């Protein structure tokens, strides 16, 4: 089966392609604007949106399955191994599991505002660490479409906007899931750009994400060693590697 090739190259003569730069700049601006309001939302609003997203995912299961079948058909046409196709595949049970995952995130303690390592100086000054939203989190990941909803849930819970770049193998599934998530945000009067999917599957765009340090505050690669090494090597955005994906606050 074909895995995403992370030996990313620029356009001719190694130059960054201007259209890719503009594409990412526009997305970055939208996400940064959304992050300002997301970071100010109270936990009840954030949890309400997560619960609405879970409800919408279950409600739109038929649509999600239909779009997922397009990815499955493309994968089989390319000769992908059945074991890898299974990672791509959505079923009603898996969609229910994804929705339940969002409900579990909603039930977690609010990470925003927690103060740790509080110390009192001799002069009485109290110094500690307070958890606050980062702003915009970028996540580059591979085939599993469940990551799309999980990443959205963890980022919204921690008051962050998220830019997602999934693997090209599951583009139809990811577009469908994100459209449902954005609908849920709209229904709860929250900025839809709290979650934006990079729909351009050109690998040079993935490279450009790693350069969008004006707008993306932290980049998280989730996938195989090749992906993680490429991001760590090429990114000018601060990187948190895969083992830290649950620590988004």
Model-predicted regions and their roles:
Residues 107, 111-184, 188, 216, ...:
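Conserved small-residue-rich beta-alpha loop and adjacent elements
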């Amino acid at each position: 089966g074909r895995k995403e090739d992370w030996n990313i190259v620029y356009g001719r003569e190694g130059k960054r392609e201007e259209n890719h730069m503009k594409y990412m700049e526009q997305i970055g601006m939208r996400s940064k604007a959304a992050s300002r309001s997301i970071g100010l939302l109270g936990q009840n609003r954030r949890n309400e949106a997560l619960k609405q997203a879970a409800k919408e995912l279950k409600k739109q299961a038929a649509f999600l399955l239909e779009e997922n079948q397009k990815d499955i058909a493309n994968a089989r046409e390319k000769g992908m191994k059945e074991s890898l196709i299974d990672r791509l595949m959505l079923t009603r049970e898996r969609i229910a599991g994804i929705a339940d995952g969002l409900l579990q995130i909603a039930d977690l303690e609010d990470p925003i505002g927690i103060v740790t390592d509080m110390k009192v100086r001799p002069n009485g000054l109290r110094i500690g660490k307070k958890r606050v939203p980062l702003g915009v989190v970028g996540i580059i990941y591979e085939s599993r479409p469940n990551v799309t909803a999980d990443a959205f849930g963890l980022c919204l819970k921690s008051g962050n906007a998220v830019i997602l770049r999934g693997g090209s193998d599951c583009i139809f599934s990811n577009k469908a899931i994100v459209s449902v998530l954005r609908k849920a945000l709209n229904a709860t009067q929250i900025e839809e750009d709290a979650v934006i999917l990079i729909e351009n599957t050109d690998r040079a765009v993935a490279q450009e994400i790693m350069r969008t340090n004006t707008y993306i505050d932290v980049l998280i690669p989730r996938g195989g060693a090749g992906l993680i090494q490429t991001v760590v090597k090429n990114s000018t955005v601060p990187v948190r590697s895969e083992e830290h994906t649950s620590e988004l606050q």
